[in-house]
Amino acid sequence: MSKPPPKPAKPGQVKVYRALFTFDPRTPDELYFEEGDILYISDTSDSNWWKGTCRGRTGLIPSNYVAEQAESIDNPMHEAAKRGNLSWLRECLDNKVGINGLDKAGNTSLYWACHGGHKDVVEILLSQPNCELNQQNKLGDTPLHAAAWKGYSDIVEMLLNKNARTDVVNNEKKTALDMATNAQCASLLKRKLGGVILRTHSNAEEYLDDEDSD
């Protein structure tokens, strides 16, 4: 008895699979791929033939092949970010894989890149216009919490330069500064927090001055 076909992808949502066997096309429209190749399925509107991309080539793949002879990769961007795999990350971005997707623990790919100290991956993710900097996972931690806890001061600085929030507290009521494990991270976070406090104080004084002048 064959497995039921996978649920169709939502419009605009790319589903990613790893091929378990080589597929030999019978027509020019069909996509050739080998065992172990990554398949990016972008269009599942036809129940029999899905549109996919592999190694930069686009073509049709029988949906029953995907159901029976391919392994779903639920969070490819997260896997690439965890491993610091730049080429896979770029491939995910080229194939429109969602950048802010959450895994089961509520982590984004940016969180895993920060957690792993993969500066080059962090740089690419931060260059994307819709990258969510302050997403909290199920423990309440943000990418900034992860970088501070792991002691990656260069990544902390990159996040702060993109205006990551320093006032977010996790489930244990800790900010990124509370979790900083080295002096360099703590210093960067204190400086940023100091700037925020100074600006807030300055704004408050301006407000009071306005009140007095009324």
UniProtKB/Swiss-Prot annotation:
Annotated ranges, domain SH3: 12-71
SUPFAM superfamilies in the cross-refs: Ankyrin repeat (SSF48403), SH3-domain (SSF50044)
Annotated SMART domains: ANK, SH3
Keyword presence, Calcium: no
Signal peptide: none
Protein origin, superkingdom: Eukaryota
Cellular component terms (Gene Ontology): cytoplasm
Gene3D superfamilies tied to this protein: Ankyrin repeat-containing domain, SH3 Domains
Location in or out of the cell: Cytoplasm
InterPro entries, per database record: Ankyrin_rpt, Ankyrin_rpt-contain_sf, SH3-like_dom_sf, SH3_domain
ANK repeats: 72-101, 105-135, 139-168
A Pfam family: SH3_9
Keywords recorded for this protein, A-Z: ANK repeat, Cytoplasm, Repeat, SH3 domain
BP GO annotations: signal transduction
Disulfide bond sites: none
Primary location group: cytoplasm
Function: Induces bone resorption, acting probably through a signaling cascade which results in the secretion of factor(s) enhancing osteoclast formation and activity.
Designated name of the protein: Osteoclast-stimulating factor 1
Source species of the chain: Danio rerio (Zebrafish)
Lineage, uppermost ranks: Eukaryota, Metazoa, Chordata, Craniata, Vertebrata
Annotated gene: ostf1
